[in-house]
Each structure stands twice: as C-alpha cells, then as structure tokens.
Amino acid sequence: MKVILKIRFNASSESFEKFGQNRYFLYLSNPEHEHSSQIIVKILSRKLGVPLEKINFAFKDNTGNWVFDVD
C-alpha cells in the first residue's frame, strides 16, 4: 500500500495525524536534511505498527508530498 505524508519541518511540536485514506500530516521539530527519509520511516514504523524493513521511501511528488511503500 502507498502512504502519503504531508510533512512540516521546523514545527513547534511533533505530531502525527491521519486526514484521509492512507494520508497523514507529520509535524517534525527538526529541519529537513539528507537523512530525513530514514527518520520518517522509523516514525511510520512506530505509528503504523509495521516493521522497519516493510517501509520504503518511494518518492517526493511535485506538490511536496512524501510517498512511502508499505508491504
């Protein structure tokens, strides 16, 4: 299944909210950097209850959404 995230970096507090079928808002207090996708995979694993190895970063679309494949 595909999971789509709208991510706001540098937020005042961290939160994870569902807003549709396989769509989530993720607010992170740290800035975006080259290892952001690895951090997000760990958060998704914890929040969705899925093992780390079953979640893979797919792409970042042209609207800024982050797309992950969850097996």
Residue ranges and their predicted role:
Residues 1-71:
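Contiguous, often N-terminal, cationic amphipathic patches that form binding interfaces
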